[in-house]
Amino acid sequence: MQVTCAALFPDGLTMPVTSRFPFFAYLFACLLGLFALGGFWYGLGKPVILPDVVSATHKLQCASYTPFDKDQSPFDVPFKLRPERMDADLALLATRFECIRTYSMTGLEALPDLARKHGLKLMIGAWVNSNPVDTAKEVDLLIASANANADVVTSVIVGNETLLRKEVTGAQLAILINKVKSQVKQPVTYADVWEFWLKHPEIAPAVDFLTIHLLPYWEDDPSNIDAALQHVAEVRQVFGNKFAPKDVMIGETGWPSEGRQRETALPSRVNEAKFIRGFVAMAEQQGWHYNLIEAFDQPWKRASEGAVGGYWGLFDADRQDKGVLAGPVSNVPYWSQWLVVGGLIFIGTLILGGRVRSTRAALVLPLLGALAACSIGAWGDLARVTTRFASEWLWVALLTGLNLLVLAHAALTLSTRTGWRAQAFNAFERRAGWLVAVTGFAAAVTMLELVFDPRYRSFPSVAFIVPALVYLCRPVSVPRREIALLTFIIGAGIAPQLYQEGLQNQQAWGWALVSGLMMVAALWRCLRVRKG
């Protein structure tokens, strides 16, 4: 008996179909698929052993602290701080740090008393911006708090990255610093990215010590994790020599645990732990003063900085230890839950495919289910950390639903297509062109975003693997004019996207592979299918 198998032989070749279920081929493919699924998630989530940062009894110097819960933002109107949250936060931080650094005075009136209660010292900061009224209010509160809490406030910071944002001039900032110095007893400083200290040397004489921000991930020329500590050491050495005898404090340094790759700088929990543990060991050995960014993950920062902005914390937004400072650390701590989700997708694929008859279908169906389980699960994990707004959740739901529909179409194509499976297959077959069109549209929109507005966007490559592969292997009839335009947009964006990201960006290459080699090829093959 012979049958055309368009799912596997799109040019219309034929293959034999047996009357018996190919049990051993099916069993082999199922075991291989399950092994691949388990290996994929365990490989991503397995605990990595690193040298601990310090002994459990040794406290670190300082950490940046903002008192926002995971559902809060400083832009909330009206904004209400939660005193019980601040109290619990400081109790937790007091077990690992000697001091905390703040960035604004507004709403933090209770902080000195809480710091005193938990034995913490404070570096308090006034938020300086382009509005002179707001700035004057912040500076007045800074002076008052420093004088009223001299036992816990060890130093004051007049402005944070204000020159970077170009909200005041160097001369205006120096006047503010001198005003504060004349009215407090504590050392006074200003904090900014290290390059801006070099661009504005007139600020150095006004401060008692320099506070520089050293974030290798955000550098114009990002450092990979293996070179990041050397870069920090070199910059610190330059400042120590240039501005001696004034002390230089590293006021912000750290590494993100989630987010998009920048050239060779890859965010991950393991890389964050590598950087923090290595930096602290180096700083303690060199006798540097430092402040780590930051105490807790801040999801609200994702709105302005993309996913990466929300994940610089030593603890997550639920105040759970991320394993950055000590013990084993996992890049995907929820890998076992995603494994369960993947298992359900795998089983669902087998159920849709049913009792296949050909040996080739028996091999392909379980492997298709395993691939879909991995890619859809990885897309879900990416969405968990990147999605910020209702519109973005709608986009996630659209792509997830699209993947499941395409997976169902592919599984039914591999089935014997009898009974309800035949009816479902025919329904999918009539609408397959629109599934391709929606996939192409989503890929084209993503490509345009990654070409024209890439800085804070992650690479959603895993969301397109299943649709691209399915319709590459089995092209279907599509609306020609629309698909031709989408194919051109995606294909034209590959080179500029790679050029912007740099040829060493593995995530960018992953997107180029999925969108270029797979998606463009799939759309092109679909364009060549004539309507029946």
What residue ranges belong to the model's regions?
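N-terminal carbohydrate-binding/catalytic regions of secreted carbohydrate-active enzymes
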Residues: 64-137
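Active-site clefts of carbohydrate-active enzymes
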Residues: 214-222, 242-272, 301
